[in-house]
Amino acid sequence: MTRRTILRGATIGAALPLIGAPLVARAAEIELKYGNNLPLSHPLNIRSQEAADRIAKETNGRVEIKIFPNNQLGGDTDMLSQVRSGGITFFTPSALVIATLVPVAAINAVGFAFSGYDQVWKAMDGPVGAHVRQAIEKVNLYAFEKMWDNGFRQMTTSGRPIESAKDMAGLKIRVPVSPLSIAMFKALDASPASLQFSEVYSSLQTKIVDAQENPLPIIQVAKLYEVQKSCAVSNHIWDGFWFIANGRAWRGLPPDVQKIVAAAINDAGVAQRNDIKKLNETVQADLQSKGLAFNKTDPNSFRAKLRDSGFYKDWQERFGKEAWDLLEGSVGKLA
């Protein structure tokens, strides 16, 4: 957060954001910079713009949020550093990104923890989310109450369909560079390979790996249906975005402005969740029309395998008893 008199000197020559709050009759007293890594067309940016417009209106033009989408301000690591230093006010990292700073933030990505969105929001709008927000606050960041949706991850393969845990044995599958993801697939007896996303298509094409896992919109955009035959609706990991603010900047806002900003951002986050649900339904139909076959999976077989392998017990110890008990209170017994 900066006052206009400070910002004017600091931003001469900087790239202008593609979107921001609407023009108001007078100059804003408070300017807030928000960076993210998604394109303008993504529901996160559409709803963020709505929140920015609402905030400008409800503060009578006192507050302007400038939105810098699509990695304009750098990658996730860069923006996480900037929001910590106060270079930007807001950032929306995925839980797995902020977990590099706050490890317990990755707890929502425990494999096969959630049976569906009802359990996700019960946990993340409830005690699990509150626990993570407290941990985020300890590193001088403020996390808004409502988490934004990044979707469930699904598995695709070029060979036989994945229907139960036994189908994972020996499967060469690309996974992101995440200790939690790597550990889960190893526990399922697969052979996970950590590759940059830019390498996924060619690696599938050349059979370096036979499978991969991502949310459906990513599978669509990357045209992975061209090199994969089937998609298992596994919902094996859910990830979301935390809308976070620099702690000092947030505390420096007048109380009335805090109230308006928090309400607008939380309401926008809830609306974005429904957008993602509708988007996934549309994307699945499109992928099916392009020849990607979909099949259901047996989640109980995966949970049993992870339990028997000691995966859940190991991560219970890593996350700590308090956080794990809160998770199991929302989803049932895992370890």
Predicted regions: what they are:
Residues 2-19, 24-119, 127-335:
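N-terminal secretory/targeting leader peptides
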